[in-house]
Curated annotation (Swiss-Prot):
Keywords: ATP-binding, Cell inner membrane, Cell membrane, Membrane, Nucleotide-binding, Translocase, Transport. The complex is composed of two ATP-binding proteins (BtuD), two transmembrane proteins (BtuC) and a solute-binding protein (BtuF). It comes from Vibrio parahaemolyticus serotype O3:K6 (strain RIMD 2210633). The gene is btuD. GO terms for molecular function: ABC-type vitamin B12 transporter activity; ATP binding; ATP hydrolysis activity. Residues 2-240 form the ABC transporter domain. Belongs to the ABC transporter superfamily. Vitamin B12 importer (TC 3.A.1.13.1) family. It is found in: Cell inner membrane. This is Vitamin B12 import ATP-binding protein BtuD. Part of the ABC transporter complex BtuCDF involved in vitamin B12 import. Responsible for energy coupling to the transport system.
Length: 255
């Protein structure tokens, strides 16, 4: 279980606390500039006291923020929003670089994990392509595969948390479906998943818990159906939303 205690980043993110249980999928939602990316970066440990970050992130009996970067990498995976790297390798080599330290891609368990993740995000025909020749959606699927291999339990038994900052942004509708299959596979291993997300209907369907941010403040948290209420969304997003039932599932319709 992850326990976040009074995490804050200067005036960008005021102190907030919450928990993420093992295998729980928590979505962080809110308008642009509400503090979603700042919160995830602070929890990941990439923002430090020099950046104005404070608070504690406890994973089991460890404060993640006091660990070295290499120790953090064994406990959590973090996919931020970023452009393509300057170096050039093929997809298979990139995935090999993403594996936890001390593992070899020739190991049977590692090979099985790589094959499973590659199949989940449908990269089988891309393994020998240069990462610089991939489309935006293809490259994002490679990044997702890499960060998931970092925390995949059969090759990294110490992993506890996966943090994804707007992972669906470069993906089309079909690829977005693959993303949520991958998230489900990670959560099924008992790993908590923290996702910054803009598609509120996806949040209604997939999130076990939701944090709704507004101007760096935690507006509300809890079950998706409760947090994403018509009144709460109108207050935070300054727009009207209606919640309707289709095939016994709730959907949001925005004016």
């Amino acid at each position: 279980m992850m326990r976040v205690k009074h995490i804050a980043v200067g005036s960008r993110l005021l102190p907030l606390s919450f928990e993420c249980k093992d295998g729980e999928v928590v979505h962080v939602v809110g308008p642009n500039g509400s503090g979603k990316s700042t919160l995830l970066a602070a929890i990941s440990g990439t923002l430090t006291g020099r950046d104005g970050a404070s608070g504690e992130v406890h994973v089991d009996d460890k404060n993640l923020l006091t660990l070295s970067l290499s120790e953090q990498a064994h406990v959590r995976g973090y996919l931020c929003q970023q452009s393509r790297p300057a170096f050039n390798v093929d997809v298979f080599q990139y995935l090999a670089l993403s594996l936890p330290s001390g593992t070899a891609i020739t190991d049977g368990k590692v090979r099985d994990a790589v094959n499973m993740v590659v199949e989940l995000v449908q990269l089988q025909d891309k393994l020998h392509r240069s990462i610089q020749t991939l489309s935006g959606g293809e490259w994002q699927r490679v990044r997702l595969a890499g960060v998931c291999l970092q925390v995949w339990r059969t090759i990294n038994p110490y992993s506890q948390l996966l943090i994804l900052d707007e992972p669906a942004a470069p993906l089309d509708i079909a690829q977005e479906g693959l993303l949520y299959q991958l998230i489900n596979a990670i959560a099924a291993q008992g790993i908590g998943v923290l996702v910054a997300n803009h598609d509120l209907n996806r949040t209604l369907k997939h999130a076990d818990k939701v944090l709704l941010l507004s101007n760096g403040v935690l507006h509300s948290s809890g079950r998706a159906d409760d947090v994403l209420s018509e009144a709460g969304l109108a207050e935070v997003f300054k727009t009207q939303a209606r919640k309707v039932m289709i095939d016994e599932r709730p959907y949001l319709i925005f004016d």
